A protein has these predicted regions:
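Conserved catalytic core of the tyrosine transesterase superfamily
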Residues: 1-150
Length: 150
């Protein structure tokens, strides 16, 4: 688990705008690594400030809220890269970014930020949930946000 300050340092130290955006989505929406990797440009609804997560665990779509800051970061990423289908395309743009690429990005960011703890993309999801709990959000609400089985 990372503190809020460590998360902020890690995101700022991300090796690229693409990595920063992908890791920010992982933390800011509490997504699994596979869910981040499989996001499409069309999953962003800037009017409703939501992000559709297709075929998450249980094979059903869900919607997560986007903060204004996260939406602006995604817009910056889109303007810079103009991804076509996948929000975070892989080395071959017809494929999405891989879980391994996201793991490498989080490790590089943690190292650059001077974070000595073992950090993975799942650490960001865990930190998201813990920070909500620390703010007094009901555990059942957090479970719904994370789409966890009760």
């Amino acid at each position: 688990m990372l503190s809020k300050e460590e998360v902020a340092r890690l995101l700022e130290a991300a090796p690229s705008l693409k990595s920063k955006a992908a890791l920010s989505v992982a933390y800011g929406a509490g997504l699994r690594v596979s869910e981040v990797a499989n996001l499409k440009v069309s999953d962003i609804d800037s009017q409703r400030m939501t992000l559709r997560v297709e075929q998450g665990k249980g094979q059903r779509d869900r919607y997560v809220m986007l903060s204004p800051q996260l939406l602006e970061l995604l817009r910056d990423w889109w303007r810079a890269a103009r991804p076509q289908a996948w929000l975070f395309p892989g080395q071959n743009p017809v494929n999405p970014m891989t879980a391994r690429q996201l793991c490498r990005a989080v490790h590089a960011a943690a190292q650059a930020a001077g974070i000595a703890k073992r950090v993975s993309p799942h650490t960001l999801r865990h930190s998201f949930a813990t920070h909500l709990l620390e703010q007094g959000v009901d555990i059942r609400v957090i479970q719904v946000l994370l789409e966890m089985a009760t």
